[in-house]
Amino acid sequence: MHIRAATMDDMPALMELWTAAGLKFRRGDVPVELAAVLARDPELVLLADNERGLATAVLGTFDGRRGWVNRLATRPGQRGRGHATALLAELERRLAAKGCRKVNLLIEADNKPVTSFYEQNGYSTDQLIFMEKWLPA
């Protein structure tokens, strides 16, 4: 497995991986928004390639105070090989190098396998309520 930073050329493969992994696409999960993330934090959008191609990806961000783990996904059929754990550890290392001291992530409440994965990697649940508001374009 080879971990590397994503480029704009990787966007089609990244979108295909997320689709194959069953991730839901939301309003902000469009190429133009992803390009902005990649321009801002190019070293935090990570891919793990193996002999079969793109296996795992994660979209990391850092707002200067908190790091965020977004859209960590492994291709079905390649799960259980440690790819996601390795990619998460590399993202955490890169966030720490930027001065990040706390990492956050959001999981859909009914996604127990993913909750368990993050708990096994040292994350804990907080009793916060997530709210959002879309602003006019």
Residue ranges and their predicted role:
Residues T56, P113-F117:
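A short, acidic/glycine-rich surface segment
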Residues L95-I107:
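Conserved GNAT acetyl-CoA-binding A-motif
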Residues R81:
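Flexible nucleotide-binding loop
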Residues P76, L105-V114, E132-P136:
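Conserved beta-strand-loop-alpha-helix junction that forms the acyl-donor binding cleft
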Residues T85:
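Residues forming the Rossmann-fold NAD(P)(H) cofactor-binding site
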Residues M1-H2:
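Extreme N-terminal starter segment of soluble prokaryotic enzymes
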Residues A5-R71, R75, L88-E90, R94, ...:
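Acetyl-CoA-dependent GNAT
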Residues Y118, Y123:
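Conserved active-site tyrosine of GNAT-family acetyltransferases
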